[in-house]
Amino acid sequence: MRRKLVVGNWKMNGNLAQNKRLLEALVRGLQDVEHVDIAVCVPYPYLFQAQKILSGTNIAWGAQNVAKHENGAYTGEVSAAMLKEFGASYVIVGHSERSDAYCESNANIAEKFAIAKHYGITPIFCVGETLQERESGVMEYAIANQLDAVLSVSGGALLDQAVIAYEPVWAIGTNRTATPEQARAAHSFIRERIAAMHPGAAESVRIIYGGSVNPRNAAQLLSMPDIDGGLIGRCSLDADDFERICRAAC
């Protein structure tokens, strides 16, 4: 049975004082949660702070992006080896906000996925469709293209200990949320697509949902078949909200 995973994506938020209060509140509030894996993905400058506060707790930490290169003349980039030095367990790759703003291709995202795996960091690989793609009836085609880019480069073996996050782009940072049935159908399609190419990986890979999850809808969403947890944006910045979502996943 797949263990649930709840990941907070802080995006470009926080400062040292706010982070300290939030992280310490999460440590206190979640210390008795035993049956859910919990992580926060913080901005690069705060990795050391997260490492310092969260070490020895039941909360892991990670980053929101990684370079596809190991090292070299890539100004502004941060390598997987650097993330590993700060104890990062997870890294988000392919989030729609980055793909849109920085024109990241599926091939580029696949390289980031592979290098994270090479350094022992669990990639959280985001896939999803725009509202136009959903309304045009090509949702599955759009998701399949994103999945196939990684599967063709990495193969099924690299899905071991990886995470896929289904994030309907039209629900990111909005008040719109996929219905539980819409989310379940998308997760089921993703698992079936993986099974068609790499049967051994399909049942073990965790597929989490990201799209305006909040304390009010978390229990219903996270109880659906094939939904193995959540990638939480706005509500991960509030300790009470994030704790309630984590407990809803139990």
Swiss-Prot record:
GO biological process, one term: glycolytic process
Cystine bridges: none
Annotated residues for binding of substrate: N9, W10, K11, G173, S212
Enzyme active site: H95, E167
GO molecular function, one term: triose-phosphate isomerase activity
Main location per the UniProt record: cytoplasm
Known pathway: Carbohydrate biosynthesis; gluconeogenesis; Carbohydrate degradation; glycolysis; D-glyceraldehyde 3-phosphate from glycerone phosphate: step 1/1
Catalytic reaction equation(s): D-glyceraldehyde 3-phosphate = dihydroxyacetone phosphate
Top-rank taxon: Bacteria
Enzyme class: isomerase
Transmembrane segments: none
GO terms for cellular component: cytosol
EC number(s) recorded for this UniProt protein: 5.3.1.1
Functional note: Involved in the gluconeogenesis. Catalyzes stereospecifically the conversion of dihydroxyacetone phosphate (DHAP) to D-glyceraldehyde-3-phosphate (G3P).
Family of this protein: Belongs to the triosephosphate isomerase family.
HAMAP family on file: TIM_B
Record text on subunit structure and interactions: Homodimer.
Protein name: Triosephosphate isomerase
Gene: tpiA
